[in-house]
């Protein structure tokens, strides 16, 4: 899961379905 204050995105964990985390996931891909 994703913590809103950290905005972490991992391969094993699904990104937040919110706005920011999804963008970060693509950037850190």
From Swiss-Prot:
Q: Name one GO cellular component term.
A: extracellular region
- In which tissues or organs does this protein occur? Expressed by the venom gland.
User: Listed GO molecular functions?
Assistant: potassium channel regulator activity; toxin activity
Query: Which cystines does this chain contain?
Result: 2-16, 9-21, 15-25
Carries keyword Secreted? Answer: yes
Q: Supply the alphabetized keyword list.
A: Calcium-activated potassium channel impairing toxin, Disulfide bond, Ion channel impairing toxin, Neurotoxin, Potassium channel impairing toxin, Secreted, Toxin
Compartments (UniProt record) = Secreted
Question: What exactly does this protein do?
Answer: Insect-selective neurotoxin that potently blocks insect calcium-activated potassium (BKCa) channels (Slo-type) in cockroach dorsal unpaired median (DUM) neurons (IC(50)=3.7 nM). This occurs in the absence of any shifts in the voltage dependence of activation. At high concentrations (330 nM), it partially inhibits cockroach delayed-rectifier potassium channels (Kv) currents. May interact with the turret and/or loop region of the external entrance to the channel and does not project deeply into the pore of the channel.
Domain remark from Swiss-Prot or TrEMBL: The presence of a 'disulfide through disulfide knot' structurally defines this protein as a knottin.
| Family to which this protein belongs | Belongs to the neurotoxin 30 (phrixotoxin) family.
> Any other comment in the entry?
Negative results: does not show activity on insect voltage-gated sodium channel (Nav) or insect calcium channels (Cav) in cockroach DUM neurons.
Name assigned to this protein: Lambda-theraphotoxin-Ec2a
Q: Which organism is it from?
A: Eucratoscelus constrictus
């Amino acid at each position: 899961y994703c913590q809103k204050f950290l905005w972490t995105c991992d391969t094993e964990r699904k990104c937040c379905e919110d706005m920011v985390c999804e963008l970060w996931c693509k950037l850190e891909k």
